[in-house]
């Protein structure tokens, strides 16, 4: 800005979209550890619907910064008009969906203004996080594939190139493993052409072996009963 003194920003959205349709159906995602991304779909009517969080760096723990908006019918996989959006921001966020008296819908996306005052010095630039969205006329399937293609092209390193594959033992064994079980995993993974193996939680501590999630953290030595020959 070009003022002589700093100015304070209190509310700074990334985007405003205005849509016109007969009906609007919103899908949001919520959850917790081991129960993530549960879908809830609801029809929007007159007034405001807000999806937001004030958990800071844990912002996506219970409330996902992502939504579908289906026009004129509930969201379907292979048909219908779908707007799918997210925000490139890992902190507090807010999406506001407001249906007005003429049945128009405004979608405002950005950083949550709660406790987000920002002092901007003279002759400096402030940029809001990107609101990333796609529009599909062929349902949620096309919209999600649009996001996949965007991520491969612009966000993931070497997203369009061949990448190495990795096997993690966690879902196969949890804490219950030994050398023989791991070697069996190696063999099956090798048949599939997997490049790397990652040994997950449960390999450390002897006095209080890491056989569950209530003991062993910090004792960084191989559990002899599980790995007698070490890692």
Task: Show which residues each predicted segment covers.
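Short Pro-Gly-centered flexible turn/kink motifs
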Residues: 118-137
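Glycine-rich, acidic/polar active-site loops that bind/position phosphate-bearing ligands
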Residues: 115-120, 192
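Short, intrinsically disordered, charge-balanced linker/junction segments flanking boundaries
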Residues: 109, 122, 228-231
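Glycine-centered helix-coil hinge/cap
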Residues: 31, 139-140, 156, 226-230
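Aromatic-lined carbohydrate-binding/catalytic grooves of carbohydrate-active enzymes
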Residues: 158-231
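Acidic/glycine-rich phosphate/pyrophosphate-binding loops and surrounding catalytic core
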Residues: 87-93, 99, 132-151
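N-terminal amphipathic alpha-helix/helix-capping segment at the start of soluble metabolic enzymes
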Residues: 120-121, 148-163
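Polysaccharide-binding surfaces and accessory modules of carbohydrate-active proteins
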Residues: 1-99, 103-105, 114-116
